[in-house]
């Protein structure tokens, strides 16, 4: 039996694609940009929100300054709508409860912004379920997040 299990968040524990897609489309609509079907966003996600923003932004709107502004706008919209449709996948709450009952320690590491990762985990799961929840932190390389969780 495993002693510890590390989980990704989006697309693993929680189905977040609808809220991500809807938020992206709200940003696109505000700029008069093309909007995409939710199914298309499945190809846009997986490498963090900055990459998602780059992928839904038109090619002529991808300068570093434009992407930074669009990212800030997306964060604001998503922060207001990240609980609209998000839900745990079927069977996930039961799986996590069984692992916890078996004494398995669990953690969540996500490329979602840390504040958003913590917020959705707190909303959908018991507070004592995970030993640690970490999302992407500004100026911290993704692979370094595992080191943040190590005891000092």
What is the predicted function of each stretch?
Residues 84, 140-145:
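Structural motif
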Residues 104-107:
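Short active-site oxyanion
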Residues 44, 127-142:
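A short, structured active-site edge motif that brings together acidic residues
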Residues 144-152:
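Residue-level detector of conserved catalytic or cofactor/ligand-binding positions
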Residues 2-9, 13-94, 102, 115-118, ...:
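N-terminal helical cap/lid subdomain that shapes the substrate entry/recognition surface
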